[in-house]
Amino acid sequence: MLYNILFPLSSDYTILNVFKYITFRSVWSLITALILSILLGPYFIRWLQRINFKQQIHEDVKIHKSKTGTPTMGGVLICFSSLCSTILWSDLTNIYVWLTLLVFIGFSFIGFLDDYIKILHHQNKGFSAKVKLLAQVVVAGIAMLFLVSEPAYSTKLAFPFFKSLHPDFGYFYVPFAILVMVGASNAVNLTDGLDGLAIAPVIVSIFVLSVYIYVTGNVKFSQYLQVDYIAGVGEVAVFCGALIGAGLGFLWFNAYPAQIFMGDVGSLGLGGVLGFLAVLCKQELLLLIVGALFVLETLSVIVQVGYFKWTGGKRIFRMAPLHHHFELKGIPESKIIIRFWIISITFGLIALSALKLR
């Protein structure tokens, strides 16, 4: 909004030229969302406590009984802070910004309804898996239909570390992209089981993808680093900045011991938009590296369920997802969280190195 209002005046006031720089607006978008979420956090937490929007703890995780009653739906705070900051600092005529917001709001709304059902019925289960999956596919599908209709966007796939490999998926690209978004959404949802466990890796992943998005939308950088150029995509880096800031602000209250949980409104929304950002900058496969922690958590569930059915009741892990396995082994929660953060940062750096190693 500020860009649309102030930048046209730069011919008369040269200081306003600063608004044309995506990097400047991304940084201030981050700062704005961070301040907004930290300032609103205490009031929001008290309001959730007053209306009794509290977390229902899974009955199998007995060591988490002390967390029962902690306010949930903190993802609303992330969503509100990042949306306000994005609208304030981004170019509101950019189609890619609006598509990103569509995915973020859509997936967050699915999570919101899921959380509300849990709270309303005082249980740990909301939507059925089929209903939730269908809703996610619909939101992702609508976004993809708009995205592939953009002339600058292609259905080719990029392979990390292999600059000359760009197979065209054609009609199969849209279902593939939907799979990426839905998969990322549910992977983050599975990871969100300990205080601060999911939000920090999400921040790391968003930061890495924001670099790729900025490069993808910059003619010179994309040519130098041999990344597919997509005009206008770089503006989404402003949204990424807002989401990082809102995430950091949420972590202020979600760090161990948590004062608030993000709920499905946070995990589904963040995961869905994480997948869309990867699709947007043509780094769908890189997401496997960027979000390696989410992949590991998801695989632990798949392996556990598959092995349980195959052997008629035996388990590989004490409990899945993976973070619960380590909890039941007696490792302190705070240590598990920090170690998982280290894993996330390490894979984030590996993903960044792929920019040059092409």
From Swiss-Prot:
Keywords linked to the UniProt accession: Cell cycle, Cell division, Cell membrane, Cell shape, Cell wall biogenesis/degradation, Magnesium, Membrane, Metal-binding, Peptidoglycan synthesis, Transferase, Transmembrane, Transmembrane helix
GO molecular function: metal ion binding; phospho-N-acetylmuramoyl-pentapeptide-transferase activity; UDP-N-acetylmuramoyl-L-alanyl-D-glutamyl-meso-2,6-diaminopimelyl-D-alanyl-D-alanine:undecaprenyl-phosphate transferase activity
Catalytic activity, EC: 2.7.8.13
Record-level GO cellular component terms: plasma membrane
Coiled coil: none
Keyword Nucleus on entry: no
Pfam families, alphabetized: Glycos_transf_4, MraY_sig1
Catalytic activity field: UDP-N-acetyl-alpha-D-muramoyl-L-alanyl-gamma-D-glutamyl-meso-2,6-diaminopimeloyl-D-alanyl-D-alanine + di-trans,octa-cis-undecaprenyl phosphate = di-trans,octa-cis-undecaprenyl diphospho-N-acetyl-alpha-D-muramoyl-L-alanyl-D-glutamyl-meso-2,6-diaminopimeloyl-D-alanyl-D-alanine + UMP
Matching NCBIfam families: mraY
Name of the featured protein: Phospho-N-acetylmuramoyl-pentapeptide-transferase
Native organism: Lawsonia intracellularis (strain PHE/MN1-00)
